[in-house]
From Swiss-Prot:
PANTHER family: GLYCEROL DEHYDROGENASE, GLYCEROL DEHYDROGENASE 1
Pathway in which the depicted protein is active: Membrane lipid metabolism; glycerophospholipid metabolism
Annotated binding of NAD(+), by residue: G108, R109, V110, I111, D112, T130, A131, A132, S133, S139
Protein localization: Cytoplasm
Primary role: Catalyzes the NAD(P)H-dependent reduction of dihydroxyacetonephosphate (DHAP or glycerone phosphate) to glycerol 1-phosphate (G1P). The G1P thus generated is used as the glycerophosphate backbone of phospholipids in the cellular membranes of Archaea.
Class of enzymatic activity (EC top level): oxidoreductase
EC id: 1.1.1.261
Protein name: Glycerol-1-phosphate dehydrogenase [NAD(P)+]
Length: 360
């Protein structure tokens, strides 16, 4: 080797860097809500806390969290009620600005409000989900509804997750089934990510991709174990949702859990607002996109059926024409995110795909 080559090797500097924010404490199990004081003490986040909850979720778990912390912290509460979501977030930010840290106790809307308020005020966030309906309980993204459909915003990933399986199992089974569908949809999300990597050169994280695939596989293979109001089921699904959120934090984006199936879900929300839960629509979208990828779409469909999640537009109150329109409109949702639905899908093909969903 020449002297010049040796000098070149000596002067070459490795300059890659990455910042990953992951939960420090993850506490899942029966009655673990009682361990919230210990979690807060372990993290040493400050002397004051803002507890964000909703009308129902405050009764379900929020009041208990308030009572547990009242003796040791200056507790302020905030109700994330229905209304203009951005106004709700603004008010939550005002409340968070005077608190040492933020706890979100509730479902998707409450958790997302708390995460965004935490992010915008540079406060640590603890996630206390009352339902396991989607992977937002542990991710660094939040979804906010607008007149033009849901928008995805940067949010504070939780420094801790405290998921009480007794509370989660008591929620309607539809919410748990929706969470399962959201996780199983990771299968097609990572296929879209790999497709974009091959065709567009999009950066890909093997660690995040592998974790996302493994998480989806666990629920896919154990669909028979997901039963209504079972703490074992809540345990399995909640661990998967946390794992999926961690995969997103490793990737630095929602790519490990969001592909064409999510774009279809967001398009449906825009065209048929209020029809179906987020995870339910992602599950239906995953059947379609798995078919387009040439994968085991029937396996996806059958797993969703076992869990109790819908597999057709009709099952969530959406007519087939609207589903076709959503498939065609999906390419306009986050156009920078390339998926299988951006490969020239025609109206005729979209109609055939929707018909395929009803096959036995």
């Amino acid at each position: 080797m020449s002297a010049d080559r040796i000098n070149l090797l000596r002067t070459k500097v490795f300059d890659k860097s990455k910042w990953m924010q992951l939960p420090r404490d993850v506490v899942i199990g029966h009655d673990v809500i009682e361990q919230i004081p210990a979690v807060c003490e372990d993290l040493a986040l400050g002397d004051s806390v803002l507890i964000v909850s909703g009308g129902q979720t405050r009764d379900i778990a929020g009041k208990r969290v308030e009572a547990l912390l009242a003796g040791s912290y200056d507790v302020v509460t905030f109700a994330a009620n229905d209304g203009n979501p951005f106004e709700t977030i603004r008010k939550a930010e005002e409340a968070a600005a005077t608190a040492g840290f933020v706890i979100g106790v509730g479902g998707g809307r409450v958790i997302d409000t708390a995460k965004i308020a935490s992010y915008n005020t540079d406060r640590h966030f603890i996630s206390v989900p009352t339902a396991a309906s989607h992977d937002g309980i542990a991710s660094s993204r939040a979804s906010v509804p607008t007149a033009d459909g849901n928008v995805s915003l940067a949010a504070e990933p939780p420094i801790a997750v405290v998921a009480d399986t007794a509370v989660i199992a008591s929620a309607p089974h539809r919410l748990l089934a929706s969470g399962c569908a959201d996780i199983i949809a990771n299968y097609t999300a990572i296929l879209d990510w790999e497709l974009s990597h091959r065709l567009r050169g999009e950066p890909l994280s093997e660690y995040a991709l592998t974790l996302s695939r493994m998480t989806a596989e666990i629920l896919f293979k154990n669909a028979d174990l997901i039963k209504p109001h079972s703490e074992e089921s809540a345990w399995l699904v909640t661990k998967a949702l946390v794992s999926s959120g961690v995969a997103m934090s490793i990737a630095g984006s929602s790519r490990p859990g969001s592909g064409g199936e999510h774009k279809f879900s967001h398009a449906l929300e825009k065209l048929a607002p209020g029809k179906g839960l987020h995870g339910e629509k992602c599950g239906i979208g995953a059947i379609i996109t798995m078919y387009l990828h040439g994968g085991d779409w029937e396996g996806i469909r059958d797993s969703l059926k076992k869990i109790g999640a819908p597999t057709t537009p009709a099952a969530i109150g959406v007519d087939d024409e609207t589903a076709v329109a959503a498939l065609l409109a999906a390419r306009t949702i986050r156009p920078e995110r390339f998926t299988i639905l951006d490969m020239g899908l025609t109206e005729e093909s979209a109609r055939d795909l929707v018909k395929m969903l009803y096959r036995e």
